[in-house]
Swiss-Prot record:
It is found in: Nucleus. Its main location: nucleus. PANTHER family: ZINC FINGER RAN-BINDING DOMAIN-CONTAINING PROTEIN 2, ZINC FINGER RAN-BINDING DOMAIN-CONTAINING PROTEIN 2 ZRANB2-RELATED. It comes from Homo sapiens. This is Zinc finger Ran-binding domain-containing protein 2. The modification Phosphoserine is found at S9, S120, S153, S181, S188, S193. GO terms for molecular function: lipopolysaccharide binding; RNA binding; zinc ion binding. Keywords: Acetylation, Metal-binding, mRNA processing, mRNA splicing, Nucleus, Phosphoprotein, Repeat, RNA-binding, Zinc, Zinc-finger.
């Protein structure tokens, strides 16, 4: 079979004998060269590409020939003499790999070593770490522990073998049989009752003192309220006395005003009569001076008792009266 006319199709298999390595058709059950039967070890062949044929070669107008093949992975058309694709390096004839589902990484699922380990109840694990249940305990060497246990057991045996005659073991029984009449067993009950009574008395005293202090604290508050009411009543009486004194002063002022007006009206005809009856001017001058001085004293007394508002009113009234008297004199 010539290599030019040889075409690999899907299903062809390679002889499992390494010396032979012949590629057989898919329909053969034994090797065509060495006669070895087809087994599961025989690797299947897979065509990485297909020839384009005459029709596509004619359409390319002399660019490709009928023996050229097209890659199945990248669809690139390669020359017939190429065993691998020019673009993606896919082989033209490749061995069909078994579908195991592995990813195909480095050394994956190949020569895997499974080390069988047995769990032990020892103090340390397989990595030399101390187990959790032994971490809190201070465990020493086994020989030391055994020696300590042996010493303790020997000490206990020696203690048991000692004479017990030196110890008075019957003293407890003698003490139980002794007379209890010397001891006052009821004293504790009496003391408890006395303590309860004293506690009750102290509580009653504290309550009475508390009530007295509360009554004392309430008495100054009542005295304060009384003093406040008295001060309020005194202030109200003072305000009333002030208002009554003001009313009295007002009534007195009105009376003095009316009397001054009546005096002024009566004095003018007197002056006229005196002036007409008197014969000498000197007597008239003396009389007018004495009258003016008496009228000035009266005015001063009235103005002292009056308020500043009344003084202003009296000054205005006196000016009017002066103008009236001057007009009458004229």
């Amino acid at each position: 079979m010539s290599t030019k006319n040889f075409r690999v199709s899907d299903g062809d298999w390679i002889c499992p004998d390494k010396k032979c390595g012949n590629v057989n058709f898919a329909r053969r059950t034994s090797c065509n060269r060495c006669g070895r039967e087809k087994t599961t070890e025989a690797k299947m062949m897979k065509a990485g590409g297909t020839e384009i044929g005459k029709t596509l070669a004619e359409k390319s107008r002399g660019l490709f020939s009928a023996n050229d093949w097209q890659c199945k992975t990248c669809s690139n058309v390669n020359w017939a003499r190429r065993s691998e694709c020019n673009m993606c390096n896919t082989p033209k004839y490749a061995k069909l790999e078994e579908r195991t589902g592995y990813g195909g990484g480095f050394n994956e699922r190949e020569n895997v070593e499974y080390i069988e380990r047995e769990e032990s109840d020892g103090e340390y694990d397989e990595f030399g770490r101390k187990k959790k249940k032994y971490r809190g305990k201070a465990v020493g060497p086994a020989s030391i522990l055994k020696e300590v246990e042996d010493k303790e057991s020997e000490g206990e045996e020696e203690d048991e073998d000692e004479d017990l005659s030196k110890y008075k073991l019957d003293e407890d029984e003698d003490e139980d049989d002794a007379d209890l009449s010397k001891y006052n067993l009821d004293a504790s009950e009496e003391e408890d009752s006395n303590k309860k009574k004293s506690n009750r008395r102290s509580r009653s005293k504290s309550r009475s003192s508390h009530s007295r202090s509360s009554s004392r604290s309430s008495s100054p508050s009542s005295s304060r309220s009384r003093s406040r009411s008295r001060s309020r009543s005194s202030s109200s009486s003072q305000s009333r006395s002030r208002s009554s004194s003001r009313e009295r002063s007002r009534s007195r002022g009105s009376k003095s005003r009316s009397s001054s007006r009546s005096h002024r009206g009566s004095s003018s005809p007197r002056k006229r009569s005196y002036s007409s009856s008197s014969s000498s001017p000197e007597r008239n001058r003396k009389r007018s001076r004495s009258r003016s001085s008496s009228s000035g004293d009266r005015k001063k007394r009235r103005t002292r008792s009056r308020s500043p508002e009344r003084r202003h009113r009296s000054s205005s009234g006196s000016s009017h009266s002066g103008s009236r008297s001057s007009s009458k004199k004229k």
